[in-house]
From Swiss-Prot:
Enzyme Commission code(s) on record: 6.3.5.11
Note: The a and c carboxylates of cobyrinate are activated for nucleophilic attack via formation of a phosphorylated intermediate by ATP. CbiA catalyzes first the amidation of the c-carboxylate, and then that of the a-carboxylate.
Its job: Catalyzes the ATP-dependent amidation of the two carboxylate groups at positions a and c of cobyrinate, using either L-glutamine or ammonia as the nitrogen source.
Cofactor: Mg(2+)
Enzyme superclass (EC): ligase
InterPro entries, sorted: CbiA/CobB_synth, Class_I_gatase-like, CobQ/CobB/MinD/ParA_Nub-bd_dom, GATase_3, P-loop_NTPase
Functional pathway: Cofactor biosynthesis; adenosylcobalamin biosynthesis; cob(II)yrinate a,c-diamide from sirohydrochlorin (anaerobic route): step 10/10
Organism encoding this protein: Thermoplasma acidophilum (strain ATCC 25905 / DSM 1728 / JCM 9062 / NBRC 15155 / AMRC-C165)
Keywords, ordered alphabetically: ATP-binding, Cobalamin biosynthesis, Glutamine amidotransferase, Ligase, Magnesium, Nucleotide-binding
Protein name per its UniProtKB record: Cobyrinate a,c-diamide synthase
Gene designation: cbiA
GO BP of this protein: cobalamin biosynthetic process
Family: Belongs to the CobB/CbiA family.
Length: 443
């Protein structure tokens, strides 16, 4: 299948990938094109910016949580009703699991035949940009189809970089972004701020758009040159019945993989969103309450005041309604929760544990295996996901955790499971094991 697409990659984190991705999306929309965004890697936050810019959900593509055929499947299925797909890379172009580039943005590009547009930071350099691009071209080869330069001081600065790069490397330079303090995406303790928390986000997007000059004809031509995608993969998903799933969705809880929600729907779930921040309650006849990750530690005071939400979740758990929580949702279910400013607030209280904040970030891929039967995995079953948090959970007494999380260098116990309630720090991608979604609905 022909899927016009390109990858926006960077020389490093902070080069401006997200900003340029947003700019390209906005300019394609202005050209009356339907745009489908994707993000390489497990990150939840960049896709929120993509969604706000494009108006449609952005999906994650990850070579550790998925195999090649699943990646192609997501690209084919997700792009069917769109004119072009824009895929934002992760870290630097070649940064992955090792020196062979496994799991990197480049790795996904070569496995899917997707052309690359490279973003380089032009601040403080001119002809040196040619050496940077030359080195990257030596590894990326013909997949490298263009360059966009960020943080240039003006058009004359841009021309110096453009002329050097094109003369020395033969790689076309497609445009630039002027330094503009109004076109900056803010940051927070875990990375980029959640998109809808930024004040006047539309004004920021407008500043990004007006600060960038990009040859969109070349962008479109590059995307249309991408290899055809073929796959025999189709997830073995059957409709299991009719289910009601209540999903927490607001500024405290909004880290969900789009494919996870879609898989639940394919199995027969109708999804209704509720806001703990707004003291809303899940449907009383829910078969499952799904509490995803987010930033409950930032909003702990307001969440403590959400007494209707808290009581509804407690009641649901007491009558055997399925409750599944990941990371931030896991924290919210605990007895107490420390906020980012050091205050202690009450949580739902169905997990006998307290949450405290730590200076160090826990981050990385995880293989999760069940030590005993739970509502997401039966004993011995495994799935894949990742962790990304600064909090820690301390149980009130000795507790036999239901899961073992394995990283590249170690393994450790995690999570909570009792009755119909299951929680883990891991953000699991259901495509790594569709049994997770099935178990949740028929538990």
């Amino acid at each position: 299948m022909k899927v016009p697409r390109l990858i926006v990659a960077g020389t490093e984190s902070g080069a401006g990938k997200t900003t340029i991705t947003i700019s390209i999306i906005l300019k394609l929309l202005a050209n009356q094109m339907k745009v489908k965004p994707y993000k390489i890697g497990p990150d939840y936050i960049d896709p929120q910016f993509h969604r706000l810019a494009s108006g449609v959900p952005s999906e994650n593509l990850d070579l550790w949580m998925m195999n090649d055929d699943q990646i192609r499947y997501l690209l084919i299925e997700g792009s069917r009703e769109f004119d072009i797909s824009v895929i934002e890379g992760v870290m630097g172009l070649f940064d992955g699991a090792g020196s062979d580039f496994t799991g990197s943005t480049y790795d996904l590009a070569r496995r899917t035949g997707t052309p690359i547009v490279l973003v380089i930071d032009g601040y403080g350099i001119s002809a040196t940009a040619a050496a940077i691009v030359s080195g990257i071209k030596a590894y990326a080869g013909e997949l490298l189809r263009g360059v966009i330069v960020t943080r240039v001081s003006g058009e004359s600065h841009y021309r110096l970089i453009r002329d050097a790069v094109e003369e020395k490397t033969g790689v076309p330079v497609l445009g630039y972004m002027i330094r503009n303090e109004k076109a900056v995406l803010e940051s927070r303790h875990l990375g980029l701020v959640q998109a809808y928390e930024i004040d006047e986000i539309r004004e920021i997007f407008g500043a990004i758009d007006s600060s960038t000059v990009i040859d969109m004809h070349q962008i479109i031509d590059i995307a249309r040159s991408a290899d055809k995608l073929e796959t025999l993969y189709s997830p073995e998903i059957e409709r299991l019945g009719t289910f009601k799933v209540s999903v927490a969705m607001d500024s405290a809880f909004d880290f969900y993989y789009e494919e996870n929600l879609r898989m639940l729907k394919r199995m027969g779930a109708s999804i209704r969103y509720f806001s703990p921040m707004g003291n809303e309650v899940p449907d009383a006849d829910s078969d499952l309450i799904y509490l995803g990750g987010g930033y409950p530690e930032v909003f702990a005071g307001k969440l403590q005041s959400a007494t209707d939400t808290i009581e509804a979740i407690r009641h649901a758990a007491s009558i055997g309604t399925g409750v599944y929580a990941e990371c931030g949702g896991y924290m919210f279910l605990c007895r107490s929760l420390e906020s980012t400013d050091g205050h202690i607030y009450g949580g739902v209280g169905i997990i006998p544990a307290s949450v405290y904040m730590d200076a160090s970030l826990v981050i990385g891929y995880r293989e999760i295996s069940a030590k005993r039967d739970t509502s997401i995995l039966r004993a011995g079953e495994t799935a894949r996901g990742h962790e990304f948090h600064k909090s820690r959970i301390r149980f009130d007494g000795p507790y036999d955790h239901p899961f073992v999380l394995k990283s590249r260098s170690s393994s450790f116990e995690d999570g909570f499971s009792s009755g119909s309630v299951t929680a883990t720090y891991a953000h699991i991608h259901f495509l790594s094991n569709p049994r997770v979604a099935e178990n949740l609905l028929i538990a």
